[in-house]
């Protein structure tokens, strides 16, 4: 999607570097003595992933090969002095992908989604906070049973990505999803 967008704009198309955000509760990595079920607050892990293929199967293989659900990167980048300084030399990703998982909504009569839930959520990043990514794409699967949909929220910096840029990226996103399911 990103490479195609860059290509359409006549820009160089190096393999894109994404920041992937996961839930950060990698309980399976710890022995049975550790219980994080009563931990308060949101835990997340963010790690970079360079995607040099357009084949969804190869992307899946890349993701499953990442050890420790990605939490290792944060430990190496921020907690160890010897690796933190080396990793800090590299440019970070411009695009964040955050899959929030599945949420049951509606019932057996079909999908029901209260679109009013998102009316107060701005597509712009929080104005009082520092912004790490030019574009953040949050995705979740909503529904139950056979009535499930993928819902996304796109948050971008308008000084960097225009509405037409976002619209073009959303079209390419939709086309990529259609290729995957057909």
Explain the meaning of each model-derived region.
Residues 7-124, 158:
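His-Asp-centered acyl/peptidyl-transfer active-site segments
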Residues 2-3, 60-63, 170-174:
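Short amphipathic alpha-helical segments
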Residues 1-2, 70, 166:
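Short strand-loop-helix active-site module centered on a catalytic nucleophile
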Residues 14-21, 74, 127-182:
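Extended, hydrophobic beta-loop-alpha segments that form or line the acyl/peptidyl-thioester binding
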Residues 1-8, 50, 176-179:
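Active-site catalytic microenvironments for nucleophilic, acid-base chemistry
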């Amino acid at each position: 999607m990103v490479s195609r967008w860059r290509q359409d704009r006549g820009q160089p198309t190096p393999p894109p570097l994404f920041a992937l955000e996961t839930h950060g509760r990698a309980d399976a990595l710890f022995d049975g003595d550790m219980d994080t079920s009563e931990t308060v607050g949101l835990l997340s892990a963010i790690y970079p992933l360079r995607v040099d293929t357009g084949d969804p199967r190869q992307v899946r293989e890349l993701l499953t090969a990442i050890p420790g659900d990605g939490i290792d990167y944060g430990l190496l980048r921020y907690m160890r002095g010897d690796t933190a300084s080396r990793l800090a030399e590299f440019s970070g990703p411009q695009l964040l992908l955050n899959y929030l998982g599945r949420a049951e909504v509606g019932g057996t009569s079909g999908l029901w989604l209260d679109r009013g839930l998102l009316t107060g959520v701005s597509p712009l990043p929080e104005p009082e906070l520092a912004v790490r990514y030019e574009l953040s794409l949050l995705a979740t699967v909503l529904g139950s049973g056979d009535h499930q949909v993928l819902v996304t929220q796109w948050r971008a910096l308008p000084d960097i990505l225009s509405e037409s840029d976002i619209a073009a990226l959303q079209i390419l996103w939709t086309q990529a999803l259609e290729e995957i399911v057909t």
